[in-house]
A protein has these predicted regions:
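Positively charged, small/polar-rich N-terminal and surface patches that mediate targeting and assembly
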Residues: 1-99
């Protein structure tokens, strides 16, 4: 199982979510609709001075679905090369028992 974290410019949010939902059956995720911060080139604070904003999408996927998600995100990056899109995929260790 993998944890996928995606941070991207709000301008590509619809393309990303539609691509993932269309191509990965039962794609479940958590969406954090607005993030503020600083990327490599500029601030994204949602203000008059720094108007751009990011969003974050988190999902837990089986390995084949994580591979599909990576392919989908690569296609969106190719379509929108100037928009900030960062994808992080990590291994997940599941723990069971009393907490």
């Amino acid at each position: 199982m993998k944890r996928m974290e995606l941070i991207a410019n709000k301008s590509v949010e619809n393309e990303i979510i539609e691509g993932l939902e269309k191509n990965i059956p039962d794609f479940y995720y958590t969406l954090i609709p607005e993030l503020h911060g600083r990327g490599k080139t500029k601030y994204k604070l949602g203000t008059a001075t720094w108007p751009e904003r990011n969003f974050m999408l988190i999902s837990f996927l089986d390995d084949p679905e994580a591979d599909k998600a990576e392919t989908i995100i690569r296609k969106v990056k190719e379509q929108f090369p100037r928009e900030g899109i960062k994808l992080f995929i990590m291994e997940v260790v599941l723990f069971c028992g009393n907490f």
